[in-house]
Amino acid sequence: MPIQVLPPQLANQIAAGEVVERPASVVKELVENSLDAGATRIDIDIERGGAKLIRIRDNGCGIKKDELALALARHATSKIASLDDLEAIISLGFRGEALASISSVSRLTLTSRTAEQQEAWQAYAEGRDMDVTVKPAAHPVGTTLEVLDLFYNTPARRKFLRTEKTEFSHIDEIIRRIALARFDVTINLSHNGKIVRQYRAVPEGGQKERRLGAICGTAFLEQALAIEWQHGDLTLRGWVADPNHTTPALAEIQYCYVNGRMMRDRLINHAIRQACEDKLGADQQPAFVLYLEIDPHQVDVNVHPAKHEVRFHQSRLVHDFIYQGVLSVLQQQLETPLPLDDEPQPAPRAIPENRVAAGRNHFAEPAAREPVAPRYSPAPASGSRPAAPWPNAQPGYQKQQGEVYRQLLQTPAPMQKPKAPEPQEPALAANSQSFGRVLTIVHSDCALLERDGNISLLSLPVAERWLRQAQLTPGEAPVCAQPLLIPLRLKVSGEEKSALEKAQSALAELGIDFQSDAQHVTIRAVPLPLRQQNLQILIPELIGYLAKQSVFEPGNIAQWIARNLMSEHAQWIARNLMSEHAQWSMAQAITLLADVERLCPQLVKTPPGGLLQSVDLHPAIKALKDE
């Protein structure tokens, strides 16, 4: 068979295989066209699940008579005109394929009138060459599209349609999703002459929860937590259900929108799931209705035939942004604060020469996927632009710190004078500065050690606490601060703000940099050991601890942080949220002990209480000999 150009109808039918999957696909494409036309009211009439009739009527701007024929042609659209438009799409439709594809597998009639025209015009395509016929008609300003006998000329496609009830349920779900995306549009849905759904438009500044409850149900509305989160050009708004009260019925409510376009994106779902995983069971799913707004240049919507998926240019930033936004709201539900442990305990004093002799501290290095940011000098940050209002969103959820992070990254590193070479310290003796060799792990968090024929047990959590304290305690120079990807903004009382201002110099030595305003404090940087911690819990507790202190010493603060990280609640968070050290392995124990021996050699000479316990084998040996 020679190569030849396909007839227009056949080419459109091939394209319809991607665009028109079922009647719900037709409804989606046509309703999105109505929204792009500026409609504020859309009436949808369905018969026999969409197989017999789909009628969409709107009060949008309409289509001019001269453009009706083009509207039914392939690759004809008013949404884009250049490659620049394609790279920054703000409309729902843009390919110009929907009407041509639908008309090739159905009997489609397009009737429209603009405000400038005295009469309406009707167009329909027929025949092998899809010739368009235009004739006068009676119609108000707006557009009506009628799709009759879907797949009438493609029997193979028609036989794959499900039952009338199933097909209409898919249409109903599409309308639910669209109604959640556009609260300002009235949408009416009828099936076989009976009104099924009526979603009234919500006036600007009105109660969006009314429509939310009508679509998602009162059970979701009762558990919904409002979100408003912002970072630079990224904005996250909407609701997420309290994971502690999620039911299988609520788990079906998972609606996400990117710039007003409904999406099923795995990256977004993963970020939300990760933020809720400590409160959800293995077989549970979070329930949410979220709206992500992003610069159109930073997202590609032209990656899926049905436009169900998008691709973000900075996917990691978007993932972490959504994760932090959802997590911050869930943390508001923690009603019982942790008791502050003010029990004094002698802190090990860091020895600079041992730090030099130890070389690199692998325990304190970040994960390979995160580059280490350069040291910087804290500088005042300019205010960021306010977020758009969102009904019933709590003020504490507003995060407007994008400019803070940008300024941190743009701050040049200070010039450092070359240091004179320091004399090398003599190598440490093999046994004098060692706990011994690790034999095995006992009870998941204790290491069984052997040294010079003696057996002892070492508590790995206690050893980790001492190591964290040594890492946080400043030596000759302050601890290196690492800027946060998304600064943490918290509401504080007057007493807490005063304590933070008094402790600012001590916190700076520990690598904790913050900026305060009237009622909030913004954490901009933390030391490296805290980068992987849950700062939404740790920082409020630290502020509460500082509010009870009168003297602010870096060593005491470092000691408190180390003790807090290994508290009972922090261990629960580590097991459930980060799955960190729920079961210690031999490799983890050996690495930990090596770092403790390098940074805290005094612990080897004089172990503190709770760290090391000798095991007396003589009674067991004697019992064996007696038998």
Curated annotation (Swiss-Prot):
Low complexity: bias regions: 364-387
GO biological processes: mismatch repair
Any one GO molecular function term: ATP binding
Record bears the keyword Lipid metabolism: no
Stored InterPro entries: DNA_mismatch_repair_CS, DNA_mismatch_repair_MutL, DNA_mismatch_S5_2-like, HATPase_C_sf, MutL/Mlh/PMS, MutL/Mlh/Pms-like, MutL_C, MutL_C_dimsub
Gene Ontology CC entries for this record: mismatch repair complex
Top-rank taxon, per record: Bacteria
Matching Pfam families: DNA_mis_repair, HATPase_c_3, MutL_C
Family membership noted in the UniProt record: Belongs to the DNA mismatch repair MutL/HexB family.
Function (record text): This protein is involved in the repair of mismatches in DNA. It is required for dam-dependent methyl-directed DNA mismatch repair. May act as a 'molecular matchmaker', a protein that promotes the formation of a stable complex between two or more DNA-binding proteins in an ATP-dependent manner without itself being part of a final effector complex.
Name used for this protein in its record: DNA mismatch repair protein MutL
Lineage, broadest ranks: Bacteria, Pseudomonadati, Pseudomonadota, Gammaproteobacteria, Enterobacterales
Gene that produces this protein: mutL
